[in-house]
Amino acid sequence: VIGPSAAGKSTLLRNSGLHFPYADADDLHFRGVGGTRNCDWWFSDQAVLLDTAGRYTTEEDDRQEWFSFLDMLRKERKQTPINGVMVAISVADLLTADSDSLERHIKIIRERINELMERLGLLFPVFIVFTKTDLIPGFEEFFEDLSDSEREQIWGAYLLEEGADSSPAEQFENHARDLYQKLCDLRLRKLSMQRNLERKGALYGFPDQF
């Protein structure tokens, strides 16, 4: 799991719904040891997740330490150093940063992903997760009535489907449009059930924030 500091990486894992059998209720992960901590280790029934230090994503001064960390992974797990990467991107950053800052942010994340592929010598799936979406106006009102089964579903899209004849950018745009339409369809039903005028206004405006 990579992403800047305060992007919500640990909160994402803590609320993932995964079972972490080797941790107590207050501490679900194991911290790295030594003078400089590289990552936190999250041991679940299904996977081992590495929550990397946020500075690896944003700080050029830590580049050599980042490379040493990747070399360690490749040495200890020769066949498959990692099975995939989750990139945590905070919605708070998207809402407050200017276009130049966002472009730099995206470029740095892309560089880290390229370094992972080159240093580890393999291709892997990349999952982009937008965190802190509860900061978007209307989020709480829109999703407060979800059932447990609905909360367990992933709200997103998979790009690069087999046989796709469009670019990733075009696929993203198409999927984003589909997700927006689903929000609009849900809005009609939710508005009919909401009686509080203030909450109804927030609920109505949420899809347009998307």
Where do the PLM segments sit?
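Basic, amphipathic N-terminal segments
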Residues: 1-210
